[in-house]
């Protein structure tokens, strides 16, 4: 009897394992004729592989697409062409995509340590309308970044700056004597730049965005260029400048309408936009994700053209842990929604709302059943009660894709004061996420370290902010410029270390931690924007190592605690910030500060 039971159990386990294996299908990209470290264009091969996977796999079946370790080259030719409207990016279409993943379930892309290298102007990876997908173990880079890295070799106050482009930079001096960068299918003229210390890779002290005028440039020797109109005494010989424009057409990874996505040990070394842009997604985990250089000996000083990671109109929980973010031209993480501006009151239940910023429109804003609230733009005060969408449709187009305006009908009557003349915004509360940002390193980047604008629980802990150049942590909210929602109600900032933030001035950088909602008319504000309860924002058990005065700036907060923090001063740089106060508070109540 015992033998029979053991046999039955063994058979049952065997069948269970077989059943699991049968539900997991593994593909290897080499099956499709693509080998690692070959010069073959990967774009059409990967496109065909994805089409085959979609055709062969049953709904719910687990699928793994593996890339044997090595380098894979993706060109525009043969890539997937799509019309994408991407939050906080240039809305130029069509977009060319190297690895386009759409309407997938239970898919894992495993690079096994591979390098995915792109050419031209492409979105390396897109993931849309997908569930339970994993991207892991690969890096993204471009053979010819659109940012031109140069090193100052001479700086003569009379003759101008002489510089040498990095070895990988292809360039020309145009017919009208302007330095231009070249790549596969693109030409760039550079108006601005960020200066890095040649030895430390820190952004050069008190430089912020620098002009790079190259009109009249000429070669004085092979790959040595004199720019007589470029004069800046701060750029001593040895300084490295990342010359750039302001365009941001293509993120490294674009995610939209996904549920339960994990990015594990993925590195973005360059993208002509943000490293990762996720919009209207639910539950995202980043573990070991990086927007970073290729190690301490990487000759590059820059990474992405904009933010490292950016989450627009997401919900569920965003987890970002154990990451490295360095050298990017904007924040390590930005979490927000988007206000629609009220441009017409149709009746007591219907408004027309509009996306206002030129880099944020064309994508879905809300759905029937979503909860919303209304804000007066001038004072950033809530008006009326929360409401619920019963119907929403694009107003200026026949479809959501590419729309800027929406007709929205609400369940309850709208407050009589809300109209198109006085400046009101609509905030979607359903599409707001909880955030955990933990165990990350942020260093040597332009602008700010992190930016959070969500009413859900936000925890920022155990991170290292090392020479972020601007504010390390910003809590914002803006219905006037970027139109990025919204108020923070439950924020904990703990056990972080801040080393010499604020070496430069950028937007909203009033202190190492800056709570800075954009409020045009603060003096007439009656309510408070951030907080709303005792300890709505808690800053505790952190270490600040700083050369300058401002540690905390706060505006329009109800419920702020600063306690058990250590503040150390150093002499690495000369204090220069206009804010000479350790703690500068404007319209803040229910506050407790103790070092």
UniProtKB/Swiss-Prot annotation:
<feature type="repeat" description="PbH1 3">
    <location>
        <begin position="488"/>
        <end position="541"/>
    </location>
</feature>
<protein>
    <recommendedName>
        <fullName>Alpha-1,3-galactosidase B</fullName>
        <ecNumber>3.2.1.n1</ecNumber>
        <ecNumber>3.2.1.n2</ecNumber>
        <ecNumber>3.2.1.22</ecNumber>
    </recommendedName>
</protein>
<keyword id="KW-0378">Hydrolase</keyword>
<keyword id="KW-0677">Repeat</keyword>
<keyword id="KW-0326">Glycosidase</keyword>
<feature type="signal peptide">
    <location>
        <begin position="1"/>
        <end position="22"/>
    </location>
</feature>
<dbReference type="GO" id="GO:0004557">
    <property type="term" value="F:alpha-galactosidase activity"/>
</dbReference>
<dbReference type="Pfam" id="PF23763">
    <property type="entry name" value="Beta-barrel_GLAA-B_I"/>
</dbReference>
<comment type="similarity">
    <text>Belongs to the glycosyl hydrolase 110 family. B subfamily.</text>
</comment>
<dbReference type="InterPro" id="IPR012334">
    <property type="entry name" value="Pectin_lyas_fold"/>
</dbReference>
<keyword id="KW-0732">Signal</keyword>
<dbReference type="Pfam" id="PF23764">
    <property type="entry name" value="Beta-barrel_GLAA-B_II"/>
</dbReference>
<feature type="repeat" description="PbH1 2">
    <location>
        <begin position="455"/>
        <end position="477"/>
    </location>
</feature>
<comment type="function">
    <text>Alpha-galactosidase. Removes both branched alpha-1,3-linked galactose residues of blood group B antigens and linear alpha-1,3-linked galactose structures.</text>
</comment>
<feature type="repeat" description="PbH1 1">
    <location>
        <begin position="432"/>
        <end position="454"/>
    </location>
</feature>
<dbReference type="InterPro" id="IPR011050">
    <property type="entry name" value="Pectin_lyase_fold/virulence"/>
</dbReference>
<dbReference type="InterPro" id="IPR056441">
    <property type="entry name" value="Beta-barrel_GLAA-B_II"/>
</dbReference>
């Amino acid at each position: 009897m015992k033998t029979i039971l053991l046999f039955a159990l063994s058979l049952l386990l065997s069948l269970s394992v077989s059943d699991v294996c049968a539900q997991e299908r593994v593909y290897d990209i080499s099956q499709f004729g693509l080998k690692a470290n070959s010069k073959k264009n990967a774009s059409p091969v990967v496109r065909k592989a994805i089409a085959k996977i979609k055709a062969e796999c049953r709904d719910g079946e687990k699928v793994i697409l593996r890339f044997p370790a090595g380098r894979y080259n993706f060109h525009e030719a043969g890539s997937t062409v799509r019309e994408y409207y991407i939050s906080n990016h240039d809305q130029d279409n069509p977009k060319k995509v190297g690895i386009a993943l759409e309407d997938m379930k239970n898919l894992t892309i495993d690079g096994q340590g591979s390098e995915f290298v792109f050419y031209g102007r492409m979105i390396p990876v897109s993931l849309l309308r997908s569930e339970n997908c994993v991207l892991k173990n690969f890096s993204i880079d471009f053979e010819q970044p659109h940012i031109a890295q140069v090193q100052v070799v001479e700086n003569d106050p009379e003759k101008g700056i002489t510089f040498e482009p990095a070895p990988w930079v292809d360039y020309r001096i145009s017919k009208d004597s302007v330095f231009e960068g070249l790549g596969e299918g693109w030409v760039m003229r550079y108006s601005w730049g960020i200066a890095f210390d040649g030895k430390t890779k820190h952004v050069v002290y008190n430089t912020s965005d620098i002009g790079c005028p190259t009109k009249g440039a000429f070669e004085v020797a092979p790959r040595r260029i004199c720019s007589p109109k470029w004069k800046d005494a701060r750029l001593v010989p040895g300084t490295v400048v990342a010359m750039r424009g302001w365009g941001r057409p293509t993120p490294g990874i674009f995610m939209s309408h996904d549920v339960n996505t994990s990015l594990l040990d993925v590195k973005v070394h360059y993208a002509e936009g943000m490293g990762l842009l996720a919009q209207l997604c639910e539950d995202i985990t980043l573990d070991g994700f990086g927007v970073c250089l290729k190690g301490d000996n990487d000759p590059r000083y820059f990474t992405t053209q904009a933010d490292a990671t950016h989450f627009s109109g997401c919900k569920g929980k965003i987890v970002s842990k154990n990451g490295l973010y360095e050298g990017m031209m904007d924040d390590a993480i930005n979490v927000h929604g988007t206000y629609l501006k009220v441009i017409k009151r149709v009746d007591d239940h219907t408004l027309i709302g509009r996306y206002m910023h030129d880099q944020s429109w064309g994508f879905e804003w809300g759905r029937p059943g979503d909860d919303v609230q209304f804000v007066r733009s001038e004072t950033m005060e809530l008006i009326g009660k929360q409401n619920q969408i019963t119907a929403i449709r694009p107003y200026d187009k026949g479809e959501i894709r590419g729309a800027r305006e929406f007709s929205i009908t609400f369940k309850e009557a709208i407050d009589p004061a809300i109209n198109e003349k006085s400046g009101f915004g609509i905030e979607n509360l359903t599409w707001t996420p909880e955030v955990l940002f933990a165990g990350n390193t942020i260093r040597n980047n332009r602008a700010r370290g992190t930016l959070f604008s969500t009413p859900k629980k936000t925890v920022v802990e155990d991170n290292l902010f090392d020479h972020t150049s601007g504010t390390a942590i910003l809590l914002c909210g803006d219905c006037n410029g970027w139109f990025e929602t919204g108020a923070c109600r439950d924020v904990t900032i703990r056990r972080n270390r801040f080393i010499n933030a604020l070496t430069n001035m950028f937007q909203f950088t009033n202190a190492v931690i800056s709570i800075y909602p954009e409020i045009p008319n603060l003096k007439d504000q009656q309510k408070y924007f951030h907080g709303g309860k005792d300890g709505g924002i808690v800053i505790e058990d952190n270490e600040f190592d700083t050369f300058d005065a401002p540690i905390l700036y706060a505006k329009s907060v109800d419920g702020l605690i600063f306690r058990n923090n250590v503040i150390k001063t150093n002499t690495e740089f000369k204090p220069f910030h206009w804010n000479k106060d350790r703690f500068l508070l404007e319209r803040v109540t229910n506050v407790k500060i103790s070092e």
